[in-house]
Amino acid sequence: MRPSKRAADAMRDVTLERAVARYAEGSCLVTFGNTRVLCTASLEERGPPWLRGSGKGWVTAEYAMLPRATHERTRREVNSGKPSGRTQEIQRLIGRSLRAVTNLPALGERQITVDCDVIQADGGTRTASITGAWVALHDCFAWMRARSIISVDPLKDHVAAVSCGIYKGQPVLDLDYAEDSAAETDANFVVTGKGGIVEVQGTAEMEPFSEAQFIELLALAKGGIANLVELQRKAIA
């Protein structure tokens, strides 16, 4: 039995609330159960230096947790002088995931920065961030098109992410903190709306997992992401 009493293939309640930040070109408050992340997409009228003269744009991401997003207060990373290795890994993952479904030349030489700020963490902050970031990016592009900054939608597809793991010997979908902290295996899957795999992160915390178990986790993830993509579609309708 899962601590949340969910079925093995059941996700937490997921919500995607748009236009929650007044000044951002695109924004989304995403919740996966008790995990809450504010995603904002901001337009900069210049791209990174290494793309100057290429005609291509760029999409990047930054990730942070509020000090009291966790059970005990964590120190703001800005006070330590640089982001932690975990933070750098997650924000690079978010950026890669968004670029995988973006036609960068359609942006022109501009950059979109998507900020993902965790308000409350209960497992799955990176997967919630990717799922909500896509909605914020979608709305940023819609804002740009409405003002004739770009002529076509740069988004090629949806992208969403979900965690899976093996908890007490059973493959389960969308781990919360209680499950994640005790799981034998923890994995994150990033998948497009058409079913293309963008990234897989998987770790055996205790015993190695088998190929058959990995296939089970992948099947759970694809089912969960199909539901997330449908929620994205409804959110932007």
UniProtKB/Swiss-Prot annotation:
tRNA-binding keyword on record: yes
Iron-sulfur is among the record's keywords: no
Taxonomy, superkingdom: Bacteria
UniProt-listed Pfam families: RNase_PH (PF01138), RNase_PH_C (PF03725)
Coiled-coil regions listed: none
BP-aspect Gene Ontology terms: rRNA catabolic process; rRNA processing; tRNA processing
Gene3D superfamilies membership: GHMP Kinase, N-terminal domain (3.30.230.70)
Enzyme Commission designation: 2.7.7.56
Keywords: Nucleotidyltransferase, RNA-binding, rRNA processing, Transferase, tRNA processing, tRNA-binding
One of the record's GO molecular function terms: tRNA binding
Residue sites binding phosphate per the record: R86, G124, T125, R126
SUPFAM superfamilies recorded: Ribonuclease PH domain 2-like, Ribosomal protein S5 domain 2-like
EC top class named in words: transferase
Catalytic activity: tRNA(n+1) + phosphate = tRNA(n) + a ribonucleoside 5'-diphosphate
Function description: Phosphorolytic 3'-5' exoribonuclease that plays an important role in tRNA 3'-end maturation. Removes nucleotide residues following the 3'-CCA terminus of tRNAs; can also add nucleotides to the ends of RNA molecules by using nucleoside diphosphates as substrates, but this may not be physiologically important. Probably plays a role in initiation of 16S rRNA degradation (leading to ribosome degradation) during starvation.
Membership in a protein family: Belongs to the RNase PH family.
Assembly with partners or alone: Homohexameric ring arranged as a trimer of dimers.
Protein name (Swiss-Prot/TrEMBL): Ribonuclease PH
Organism listed in the record: Methylorubrum populi (strain ATCC BAA-705 / NCIMB 13946 / BJ001)
Organism phylogeny: Bacteria, Pseudomonadati, Pseudomonadota, Alphaproteobacteria, Hyphomicrobiales
